[in-house]
């Protein structure tokens, strides 16, 4: 395998993926497989931080439509991301990989508070930093949190793990004529309205000149392959 393109990255994982075939909650086999993928990438000498969504457990936007305030709903969603990070941290540790959960909300009995210094220390010491609770503020998605944290810790790129191998002009599962893009600029991604990440995340990535690499997590070895320039992915940069 070729030398990795980046030495420090942030991997953005969807909470929905953690549900596995059951569509809700945490599927342990899926968690273990993701842990294995991250450990394999870490073995290449890459420093890895991770942001996970919480949609497999709770979605604040959906509950706010049923009468709960958006602020409360988003806060509940942040707690779901903490659950996912704790589950992944335990899976990583069980396989011998040091991992540390750092949350944007204070909950000292559960995990440590996120600071850039704590995250960078974890990475330098060979651990995987799991960054929970989004930005710690309502109205911001975990995609935006991923770009923000990546910029803060000096990551070379955000790896956006999805269930398809890049950005398409339409949902390839619904439209057989959907066009797959090898590369897009941040502005093109914003103008195209592609649903792979929200507009705020793309705009922040453009402002900070941070590449976003969109790939399929379903393929074994996909993280390492993408980081070595061998995997199928769409690069959003420039």
Swiss-Prot record:
State which pathway it belongs to: Pyrimidine metabolism; CTP biosynthesis via de novo pathway; UDP from UMP (UMPK route): step 1/1
Catalytic EC class: transferase
Q: Where, subcellularly, is it found?
A: Cytoplasm
Where does the chain bind UMP? 54, 74, 135-142
Enzyme Commission number(s) of this protein: 2.7.4.22
GO BP, one example? UDP biosynthetic process
Keyword field: ATP-binding, Cytoplasm, Kinase, Nucleotide-binding, Pyrimidine biosynthesis, Transferase
State whether keyword Transit peptide applies: no
Catalytic activity, as annotated: UMP + ATP = UDP + ADP
Q: Where does ATP bind?
A: 12-15, 55, 59, 162-163, 168, 171
A Pfam family of the record is AA_kinase
Recorded GO cellular component terms are:
cytosol
Q: How is its activity regulated?
A: Inhibited by UTP.
The Swiss-Prot or TrEMBL record annotates one GO molecular function as: ATP binding
Q: Which family does it belong to?
A: Belongs to the UMP kinase family.
Q: What does this protein do?
A: Catalyzes the reversible phosphorylation of UMP to UDP.
User: Subunit comment for this entry?
Assistant: Homohexamer.
Read off the NCBIfam families from this record: pyrH_bact
Protein's name in the database: Uridylate kinase
Q: Tell me which species this is from.
A: Rhodopseudomonas palustris (strain ATCC BAA-98 / CGA009)
